[in-house]
Amino acid sequence: MSGSAPSIPNLLTLRGRIGGGGVTRGRYRGVIHRGGRGHGPGAPSASAAHDATIQGTDTDAAVSRLSAVQIGYIDDPYAELFAQSGPGAARRLPIINRGTYARTTAIDKLVDKFLDDTESSPEGRQIVSLGAGTDTRSLRLFSPSAPTPRKRVIYHEIDFPAMCEKKQRIVCSAPQLRSILSDPDSVEELSQHGGGNSWHSKAVAEKHKGSELWVHGLDLRAIAASQQPQQPLPPGVPIGSRGLHASPFTPGSTTQHEEQTEETSLPQQREPLTLTSLNPNLPTLIISECCLCYLPPSTASSIVSFFTTTIQSSLSIVIYEPIKPDDAFGKMMVSNLAAREIRMPTLEVYKEAEDQERRLREAGFSGGEGKGIGGARSKTIEQIWEEWTSQEEKERVDALEGLDEVEEWKLLAGHYIVVWGWRGVGVDLEI
């Protein structure tokens, strides 16, 4: 994708400037937050091309992560394994590096809180990352040098089969990962749902005894379809052929697609969907970093519903998405999308922080009789920087490369949010 192609500005891969007196279009790179997880509706004829485009955006996300690592914002010794090398390839603008830092540390904070709360769970606990791509959180978590032992953590990642195969190839070929994960084993699952290239590995370090990584090659909309009434497939269309496609945060496009109803765009399933080793009786955390926002609201809700109905233990969720589409900056984002015939359907419904919190409460993250404690909270990236980052840490980050575009930072960071919810006894993500 050309660097001049119009797309939504993003806290990871922005390659331009926001005008000092107002918002200007600028020059932005195609964007995605992590991995090939942008999933929008598409016709079967365009499926393969769009899937390939989305999967390619993982490279850009990995380079953005590496930029923050190389400059010193975050510590991730595995980032370079997943980023293509080249002179100056990893350098991002300070405003983007700070966004990468704030988002990464915020989600890490919530993940750590969940794991701390569930440390005493006798059978373990599990994390499910939607559209994980080549994200390195599981590697950092299971690293021998990780600051905290994390025993009995079952970590699930779900993404396109090709993305899962790519990650397996890197894990198998990188000597430095041998101290983290055992040799991956192929997992035969989900063939009736269009899945493939699933694999499994175990954490090697004794301090993480009993922890495992399960990588599921699966079109996320198959999960949504499993929650929908079954409808017949059109003649000649194989199960799972309606893949997940490009999104506002990917350099893919949906120009070939006509508007479709949510019902006709969902992959239809012939058997109930199950994820190998997903234990309904374990405390569970779901992570969606700019994944669900590219789906129709009912599809995104069905994916969440799959987990709220499947998991019988305590359940938590962390979502990272853009908000505020109706102000000047938000309208520019939406306009950039429309120029490429791409929509973010959930952004049209969950426009503000209170909408995102209500979304989680309506999904069941509110406690109540028979459910124990629960709640839904949110912070913009700007609030996370101001409220969750210590003064000492702010000074350290400022010293790395400085930030001249303070107002630009506030504008951009105010349009991204981390929203999280929890339900059930034994987990409290009140921060």
UniProtKB/Swiss-Prot annotation:
Catalytic activity: [phosphatase 2A protein]-C-terminal L-leucine + S-adenosyl-L-methionine = [phosphatase 2A protein]-C-terminal L-leucine methyl ester + S-adenosyl-L-homocysteine
InterPro entries: LCMT1, Ppm1/Ppm2/Tcmp, SAM-dependent_MTases_sf
GO biological process: methylation
Region (Disordered): 228-268
GO molecular function terms attached to this record: protein C-terminal leucine carboxyl O-methyltransferase activity
Keywords in alphabetical order: Methyltransferase, S-adenosyl-L-methionine, Transferase
Residues the record lists as binding S-adenosyl-L-methionine: 103, 131, 159, 219-220, 289
Class in the EC hierarchy, top level: transferase
Entry EC number(s): 2.1.1.233
Family: Belongs to the methyltransferase superfamily. LCMT family.
Task performed by this protein: Methylates the carboxyl group of the C-terminal leucine residue of protein phosphatase 2A catalytic subunits to form alpha-leucine ester residues.
Protein name per its UniProtKB record: Leucine carboxyl methyltransferase 1
Organism: Neurospora crassa (strain ATCC 24698 / 74-OR23-1A / CBS 708.71 / DSM 1257 / FGSC 987)
Upper taxonomic lineage: Eukaryota, Fungi, Dikarya, Ascomycota, Pezizomycotina
Gene: ppm-1
